[in-house]
Design a protein with these regions (language model features):
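Family-specific signature for flavin-dependent thymidylate synthase
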Residues: 1-204
Length: 204
């Protein structure tokens, strides 16, 4: 199964960032000032005046393997993240990720491993529940889950933190899976059409 990314919420725009910056002088938005928004955003980005870019929000729903979830968890400033938990519920969908750049033979081996591990997870949960209780059984049976298990989580960035995320994760040095996620996120933000000049200002 592939990792999936959906943009489920957007607050703000290029105008929001510009108006935040103009709060320090005059928030009255004339036609002349509106025409200066692209240049203003470029100046702010180039000179490190980035607090106005914290006034917007980008909210994504992501389904990805554990490694990419951990990569996202490492971004804490201006980022909020919640994830489904195998401690609180049984993961019944049996979702797992197969690397697309592996050979067909290797993909089959991993798929078989995931299927077997998930079967053991469900079986262990059933065996452990009578003696340990449902709560402890759920949180301990998950040790059978493979690292390829996919979790669904929602993550929200402000634009400043999103730019930081892009610079680190949408990079050749990043792991392929998180880089693919970052690229898809950027594509979705571009398609929403609210941040054209902000993204240009940061070279994205």
């Amino acid at each position: 199964m592939k990792n999936e990314i959906e943009l489920i919420g957007v607050y703000g725009s290029d105008k929001t960032h510009a108006m935040s910056a103009w709060t320090s002088t005059n928030r009255e938005l004339t036609e002349e000032k509106q025409n200066r928004i692209p240049a203003l955003l470029k100046m702010l980005a180039e000179n490190g005046h980035e607090t106005p870019f914290e006034k917007s929000s980008l909210h994504f729903l992501v389904t990805a393997e554990i490694a990419s979830h951990i990569h996202c968890l490492k971004h804490r400033i201006g980022v909020s993240i919640n994830c489904e938990s195998a401690r609180y519920k049984e993961l019944k969908d049996d979702k797992y990720y197969i690397p697309h750049d592996w050979s067909n033979e290797e993909q089959i081996l991993l798929q078989n491993h995931c299927v077997e591990s998930l079967e053991k997870y469900h079986a262990a949960l059933a065996r452990l529940t009578p003696t340990l209780g449902r709560k402890r059984a759920k949180e301990s049976a998950r040790f059978y889950l493979p690292y390829a298990t996919q979790l669904t989580f929602d993550v929200m960035f402000n634009m400043r933190s999103f730019v930081h995320f892009q610079r680190l994760r949408n990079d050749e040095a990043a792991q392929v899976e998180i880089r693919d996620i970052a690229q898809e996120m950027l594509k979705l933000v571009k398609e929403c059409g609210e941040f054209e000049h902000t993204l240009i200002a940061f070279g994205l």
